[in-house]
Amino acid sequence: MPPTEESKPVDPAQEKQAAEALASLKEAQQPAADESGSEDEGADGTAQEAGSGSTKKKNKKKSKKKNKDKSASTESSAEVGLTEALAQADPKSALSGLTPKQIQEFIDLNPALANELLAASGSSGTTDVMEAFKKLKIQDIITGLASSGKNRKDMASYKFWATQPVPQFDEKPAIFEEGPLKIQKVEDIPDEPIPLNLAPFRWVTMDLTDEKQMQEVEKLLYGHFVEDDEAMFRFKYSTSILKWSLMSPGWRKEWHVGIRSGDTLCAFIAAVPTEIRVRDKVIQGSEVNFLCIHKKLRGKRLAPVLIKEITRRINREGIWQAIYTGGIVLPRPVSTCRYYHRALNWQKLYEVGFSPCPSNSKPAFQVRKYALPEQTSTKGLRELQVKDLDAVHSLLERYLKRFDLTPVFNREETEHWLLHKKDSYAEQVIYSYVVEDASGKITDFFSFYLLESTVIRHPKHNSIRAAYMFYYATETAFTEPFDKGALTKRLNDLMADALILAKRHNFDVFNALSLMDNALFLEKQKFGPGDGQLHYYLFNYKANPIHGGVDKKNRLDEDNLSGVGFVMV
């Protein structure tokens, strides 16, 4: 579930800068559109006719006013705005209108693109790189893009993704029949690993049942997987959470793939098997995660070979589809959700620089704002037990059918993902609770999991304990006729108790995405928007877009709830 960067609550000042950058980009496009005398689509979605010079000036002023209004807004994000602006603009006018500074910003946001431009230009000179940039297609520029300098990870270049069975940006967005993009046979898949052709690197299969090898993976991820843009926080994937996420039912040792240089583990990628439901079709697939390359090796283009090798190993098992997520724009997201954060220990989050204090407020007020009751209020609320699993499995199965993109769990998987087993893990990772009514029926459940972040070089605090919203379900969703108001109230009651329980277990912040029915309770429970996005991708499967729970302005959309019901760790 975490993106490939540490999402944090939005700083209003940064949001304003992002909006201004978007406005600047749109203004840069305007003169070229005016000079061409062609029709241009206005901000209100209607075509504006290019008329006389005076009309052009009037339209230009109108455009500037709209851009000014946008720059004052704190609702847009750089990633959504810039990619949308580029994708919808006329390619020639959009690229020719960019200043050298704006081009450099795009290159800085996209390490894979930078490598391709250097190779294409045959020179490290700035002018040559700029000219190579202007020759690209819009979709090539978008591929690998990340907002605000985040995700400085090489997730493979646009040239690589153009060769893969994934939907491309330049395909028409019309409604189409969903299904596999490429049909293959196991006998056509090579037995041997993808050639590395890079001495002294070699492929290895990591045995995560071996404590030493597990610690190697943990160390690599800690140092090189996720870090926020300012290098203030770093995700700390413990042995317990790695066992939980990478050794789920049906896991295969061969799907834990590493690259060594000598004895040093310098790259890793993993997958676990999962059934994926896309609307009315169930796919035998895999969940790919933890693509990590040592920072010093990011220029070696190891990402494409890691992706090819994990794909080869999965294909050898007769599995052809996969689901994966990331904060980077790749061809082509089936859905995009936004991160939201709810402070549980606001004072600590403020001290470490995670939560900003609004300019019109004071720390003492923020502490009061996020204070929680000591006791939960839902009658019959208790921890999940083994005896509850059949009922919870049935409830979750029915609840997930309300969404378009979900996992399909069997009883064993439900137990693995939701039940804490004290004898299996050194620390508790998953926290699950049920509501039992007077008759003994399980009517609701919710869950969240632990992912700790190290606070780098802070004199007082060394870690942040973050709770991530996992799966939940309630019988209230199945009342006839459907009562959205009742569902909203029930979810708010449950999530208010989830916050209290997380606080009781010494969590500092509660994180959630805009997926499932979360839009019904996030703002009401004082979750604030984060600066992180999570894009959902399907490999070798073409699916129509699925709503991510936010509108075009990147705000929660209570009227059109998310179709995503897949929570990835």
Curated annotation (Swiss-Prot):
| Residue positions of the active site | 569 (proton acceptor)
Main location group: cytoplasm
Q: Name one GO molecular function term.
A: glycylpeptide N-tetradecanoyltransferase activity
Q: Which UniProt keywords apply?
A: Acyltransferase, Cytoplasm, Transferase
What are the subcellular locations of this protein? Cytoplasm
Q: What is its EC number?
A: 2.3.1.97
Protein name per the record:
Glycylpeptide N-tetradecanoyltransferase
